[in-house]
UniProtKB/Swiss-Prot annotation:
GO CC annotations on file: cytoplasm; cytosol; endomembrane system; nuclear body; nuclear speck; nucleoplasm; nucleus; plasma membrane
Name of the protein: E3 ubiquitin-protein ligase RNF34
Tissue: Ubiquitous. Detected in heart, brain, liver, skeletal muscle, kidney, pancreas, spleen, thymus, prostate, testis, ovary, colon and leukocytes.
Chief location of this protein within or outside the cell: membrane
Enzyme class of the recorded protein, top EC level: transferase
PANTHER family the UniProt entry points to: CASPASE REGULATOR, RING FINGER DOMAIN-CONTAINING, E3 UBIQUITIN-PROTEIN LIGASE RNF34
Recorded metabolic or biological pathway in which this protein acts: Protein modification; protein ubiquitination
The EC number(s) this enzyme carries: 2.3.2.27
Gene Ontology molecular functions: p53 binding; phosphatidylinositol phosphate binding; ubiquitin protein ligase activity; ubiquitin protein ligase binding; zinc ion binding
Zinc finger residue extent: RING-type: 325-360
Segments of this protein annotated with the region Disordered: 194-253
Effect on the protein upon substituting residue 328 to A: Loss of E3 ubiquitin protein ligase activity
Length: 372
């Protein structure tokens, strides 16, 4: 009976060791350390006292913000500096990923005036990403020179590769052209010979005289020429519509072009509509030209009246400004400054003045005056 209880207790302790860890069961064993019999525990060498340390993988972080990559912060490689950046610190441009620093310098086109406007921090970061030492740089100009020097070396390598590719493409195109020209020339002669045979067969089969045939062919060619001219005109109009910058810009009509009401009668319907449209006048219900002329006449008269009233208002405003106090620009000039005698302020401002604002003479007294 005691042996069965001992084996059952040992199996229970093994399960607790697997589930809770060896340390939890060892805490309970300390209470039974002095016990004897089936309650005495023996250490199991298969289980360690402390849990195994987790193996840490390489921690790859963004070069700009220093945050680790995740599902929401994906890793991208900059096409210029070949460093790892997250999606927030990189810019997608023309299917190429660049970091913010490389993109900023790429926007300047590596021109010295544009580079001098950048911050020193951005220039230093650009050089550090390319593992270029900047210990000898003391001024901003040194950083700019270093950037231009490095960019010049990179552009020369690009030019060498591009020139090599272009030379290869030129040689391949030369051989392909020479190869195909040897086979296209006999085929062209054969096609021309077959065309002459077909023309001879058609003329022999048809019993129409040669003069009639020549007249028919000339008429057909004239019709074809007319159709071609019309098609060319349509194509030119479409090209002008698609590329307005290539054609001469037509000057639109406006109210300033009218010197009197008599000029309105000589304008076309298109010009009248342009004038109304530029002045936000609706002409959707107008079906005849005289209706458009009436609207333009009314618009011209209203414009003349507005200009006259605006001129009168400006004149009155100038007169009012001449009579306002030069200090507060609110009250009317009603004060004489003594001893100089200038009238440039109101009574309230004149009493506060210590010297005249015009002649800088000391103000002895400010006298209030009345205008009749």
């Amino acid at each position: 009976m005691k042996a069965g209880a001992t084996s059952m207790w040992a199996s229970c302790c093994g399960l607790l060791n697997e589930v809770m860890g060896t340390g939890a069961v060892r805490g309970q064993q300390s209470a039974f350390a002095g016990a004897t019999g089936p309650f005495r525990f023996t250490p199991n060498p298969e289980f360690s006292t402390y849990p195994p340390a987790a193996t840490e993988g390489p921690n790859i972080v963004c070069k700009a913000c220093g945050l680790s990559f995740s599902v929401f912060r994906k890793k991208h490689v900059c096409c210029d500096c070949k460093k790892d950046f997250c999606s927030v610190c990189s810019v997608l441009q023309e299917n190429l990923r660049r970091c913010s620093t490389c993109h900023l310098l790429q926007e300047t086109a590596f021109q010295r005036p544009q580079l001098m406007r950048l911050k020193v921090k951005d220039l230093r970061q650009y050089l550090i990403l390319r593992n270029i030492p900047i210990d000898t740089c003391r001024e901003k100009e040194d950083l700019v020179d270093l950037v231009l020097c490095h960019h010049g070396l990179g552009s020369e390598d690009d030019m060498d590769t591009s020139s090599l590719n272009s030379s290869r493409s030129q040689t391949s195109s030369f051989f392909t052209r020479s190869f195909f020209s040897n086979y296209t020339a006999p085929s062209a002669t054969m096609s021309s010979f077959q065309g002459e045979l077909m023309d001879g067969d058609q003329t022999s089969r048809s019993g129409v005289p040669a003069q009639v045939q020549s007249e028919i062919t000339s008429a057909n060619t004239e019709d074809d020429d007319d159709d071609d001219d019309e098609d060319d005109d349509d194509e030119e109009e479409n090209a002008e519509d698609r590329n307005p910058g290539l054609s001469k810009e037509r000057v639109r009509a406006s109210l300033s072009d009218l010197s009197s009401l008599d000029d309105v009668e000589g304008m076309s319907v298109r010009q009248l509509k342009e004038i109304l449209a530029r002045n936000f006048v609706n002409y959707s219900g107008c079906c005849e030209k005289w209706e458009l002329v009436e609207k333009v006449n009314r618009l011209y008269k209203e414009n003349e009246e507005n200009q006259k009233s605006y001129g009168e208002r400006l004149q009155l405003q100038d007169e009012e400004d001449d009579s306002l106090c030069r200090i507060c620009m609110d009250a009317v000039i009603d004060c004489v400054l003594l001893e100089c005698g200038h009238m440039v302020t109101c009574t309230k401002c004149g009493k506060r003045m210590s010297e005249c604002p015009i002649c800088r003479q000391y103000v002895v007294r400010a006298v209030h005056v009345f205008k009749s």
